[in-house]
């Protein structure tokens, strides 16, 4: 932490103020994404024609396997892992419903019930699609004492699929908890004795299971794994690579537009104390939805994300308590007339928020969805009030109880805020009823907020305390329960496991809201696992984050 004396003429009777500057690293990207060169139109059109032809071929293959459930499940799994399932949503939905009805409802089993890989794949794909198939299907793989059979010890492929399936568990499924421990322990012991590509798959899954991975990043990883298997479907792989490159061109264009907008605001100069993370913010939102139909949604959410990131830093890395009260009141009034009452340095931020919201409001009016703006403004007011409460705690050096901390920290995690904003550009499915459901704070939302807050606290605790930030959840828990930091981390891990089960329960049919809306919640949660698993990669952009961004926005696939 560095206390700097900064003159503020707009605050009466104070010529200079001491501010706890965080010294965030600057952006590493410069103008890297400012200048986007469009691909040749003829080449683009040719790729699009190839994609359409290959899509038809895959549809025919899915239809041809209707009476071969395992073969069909393998095709569905490959399309999902390769990031092209969005092209076949109806076909996949019909196929899984058919498999569910004919292998579970009628037979209460899967035809390959003595093959661990087949049963685990069947279980995982149906659970992912919301079907509450019973984990009793794994009974065949346990002995009379309830332990998993020793004969499974060398079935690496089956163990890997079992491991992936266990991450779809919900509360009360102790068998899957046991299966996770069994599969994980055994995979860890044999991974160094496996051959490529299976060994690489196991290492990757042990670090990040599919359920917690971002679909777009998982696709990049899976391309080379899938290609290494001689049995891979050449049409699927070619389609996936072509589609990846077409989408990458779209995403780079979007980011170029965003980067020019961001530079026009000149926030890096006006708010040098704040994190300049436009590119990382776009990557975050790209994790929420990458599909082409959500281009407007990405633009809206990225712009608002950039605003709230700056506001967050004003509250916890620069503003004085008196200044923050003025800003909080201005947000509550939501009126351009409030500009005159703000310190000079705050004015560009406040005006930009109003401008961004006015731009969104115009778009919502054109869509006949103006009602959404009420919710968008309410979450902004709520999160800013939360930031204000945290600033008071910090100013007073107050360490709340863990329960008191979490009640506020869930709000300032920003995940109800981001989920609300992510719905704005999603078209007709984002109904008034969907927003009311979201504002009722259902368990899946609280779980997403909890994962966000707990992972953030675990990864950034030391840095935040060094710079005099508000007490973190780790600190509050240690003080209240008289435990060491390691014990607090263990408790947080247990809470993360519980929260993921809540997420999974929220995805069981019947859905509370349309599945695409639930998917935004899941993907926002997945982003946290990617960015905050071991460190705060948003604040401190290191190799892992650079590589992830490059893989999605710089490096094309070789077809």
From Swiss-Prot:
Gene Ontology MF term list: magnesium ion binding; terpene synthase activity
Keywords, ordered alphabetically: Lyase, Magnesium, Manganese, Metal-binding
Co-factor requirement: Mg(2+); Mn(2+)
InterPro entries, sorted: Isoprenoid_synthase_dom_sf, Terpene_cyclase_plant_C1, Terpene_synth_N, Terpene_synth_N_sf, Terpene_synthase-like, Terpene_synthase_metal-bd, Terpenoid_cyclase/PrenylTrfase
Gene3D superfamilies found in the cross-reference section: Farnesyl Diphosphate Synthase, Terpene synthase, N-terminal domain
EC number: 4.2.3.-
Residues where Mg(2+) 1 binds: 312, 316
Coiled coil (residue ranges): none
Annotated motif DDXXD motif, positions: 312-316
Database matches in Pfam families: Terpene_synth (PF01397), Terpene_synth_C (PF03936)
Residues annotated to bind Mg(2+) 2: 312, 316
GO biological process: diterpenoid biosynthetic process
Enzyme class: lyase
Note describing how the cofactor binds: Binds 3 Mg(2+) or Mn(2+) ions per subunit.
Binding site for Mg(2+) 3: 464
Protein role: Catalyzes alpha-humulene and delta-cadinene, as well as beta-elemene, the thermal rearrangement product of germacrene A and several other bicyclic sesquiterpenes when incubated with (2E,6E)-farnesyl diphosphate.
Family per similarity comment: Belongs to the terpene synthase family. Tpsa subfamily.
PANTHER family membership: OS04G0344100 PROTEIN-RELATED, TERPENE SYNTHASE FAMILY, METAL-BINDING DOMAIN PROTEIN
Protein name in UniProt: Sesquiterpene synthase
């Amino acid at each position: 932490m560095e206390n700097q004396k900064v003159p503020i003429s707009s605050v009466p009777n104070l010529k200079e103020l001491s501010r706890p500057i965080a010294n965030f690293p600057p952006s590493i990207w410069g103008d890297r994404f400012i200048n986007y060169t469009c691909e040749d139109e003829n080449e683009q059109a040719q790729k699009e024609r190839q994609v359409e032809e290959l899509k038809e071929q895959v549809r025919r293959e899915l239809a041809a396997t209707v009476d071969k459930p395992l073969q069909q499940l393998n095709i569905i799994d490959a399309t999902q892992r390769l990031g092209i399932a969005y092209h076949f949503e109806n076909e996949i939905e019909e196929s899984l419903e058919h498999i569910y009805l004919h292998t579970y409802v009628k037979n209460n089993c899967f035809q390959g019930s003595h093959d661990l890989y087949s049963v685990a794949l069947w279980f995982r794909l149906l659970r992912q699609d919301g079907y509450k198939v019973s984990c009793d299907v794994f009974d065949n793989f346990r002995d009379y004492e309830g332990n998993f059979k020793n004969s499974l010890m060398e079935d690496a492929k089956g163990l890997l699929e079992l491991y992936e399936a266990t991450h779809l568990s919900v509360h009360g499924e102790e068998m899957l908890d046991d299966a996770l421990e069994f599969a994980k322990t055994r995979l860890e012991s044999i991974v160094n004795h496996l051959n490529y590509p299976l060994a690489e798959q196991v290492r990757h899954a042990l670090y990040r299971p599919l359920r917690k991975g971002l679909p777009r990043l998982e696709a990049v990883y899976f391309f080379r794994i899938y290609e290494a298997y001689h049995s891979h479907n050449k049409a699927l792989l070619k389609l996936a690579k072509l589609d990846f490159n077409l989408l990458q061109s779209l995403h780079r264009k979007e980011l170029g537009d965003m980067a020019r907008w961001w530079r026009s605001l000149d926030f890096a100069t006006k708010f040098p104390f704040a994190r300049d993370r436009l590119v990382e913010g776009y990557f975050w939102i790209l994790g929420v939805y990458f599909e082409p139909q959500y281009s407007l949604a990405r633009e809206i959410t990225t712009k608002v994300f950039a605003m709230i990131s700056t506001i967050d830093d004003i509250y916890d890395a620069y503003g004085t308590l008196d200044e923050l009260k003025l800003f909080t009141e201005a947000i509550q009034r939501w009126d351009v007339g409030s500009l005159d009452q703000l310190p000079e340095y705050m004015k560009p931020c406040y005006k930009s928020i109003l401008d961004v919201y006015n731009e969104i409001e115009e778009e919502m009016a054109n869509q006949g969805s103006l009602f959404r703006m009420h919710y968008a403004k309410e979450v902004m007011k709520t999160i800013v009030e939360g930031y204000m409460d945290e600033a008071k705690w910090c100013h007073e050096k107050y360490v709340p109880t863990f329960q008191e901390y979490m009640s506020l920290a869930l709000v300032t995690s920003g995940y109800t805020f981001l989920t609300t904003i992510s719905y704005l550009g999603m078209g007709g499915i984002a109904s008034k009823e969907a927003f009311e459901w979201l504002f009722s704070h259902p368990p899946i939302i609280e779980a997403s907020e909890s994962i966000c807050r707990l992972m953030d606290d675990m990864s950034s605790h030391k840095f935040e305390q060094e710079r005099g930030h508000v007490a973190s959840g780790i600190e509050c828990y240690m003080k209240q329960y008289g435990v060491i930091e390691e014990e607090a981390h263990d408790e947080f891990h247990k809470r993360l496991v519980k929260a993921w089960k809540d997420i999974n329960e929220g995805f069981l049919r019947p859905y509370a809201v349309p599945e695409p809306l639930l998917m935004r919640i899941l993907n926002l949660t997945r982003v946290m696992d990617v960015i905050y698993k071991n460190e705060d990669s948003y604040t401190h952009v290191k190799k892992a984050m650079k590589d992830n961004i490059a893989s999605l926005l710089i490096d094309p696939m070789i077809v």
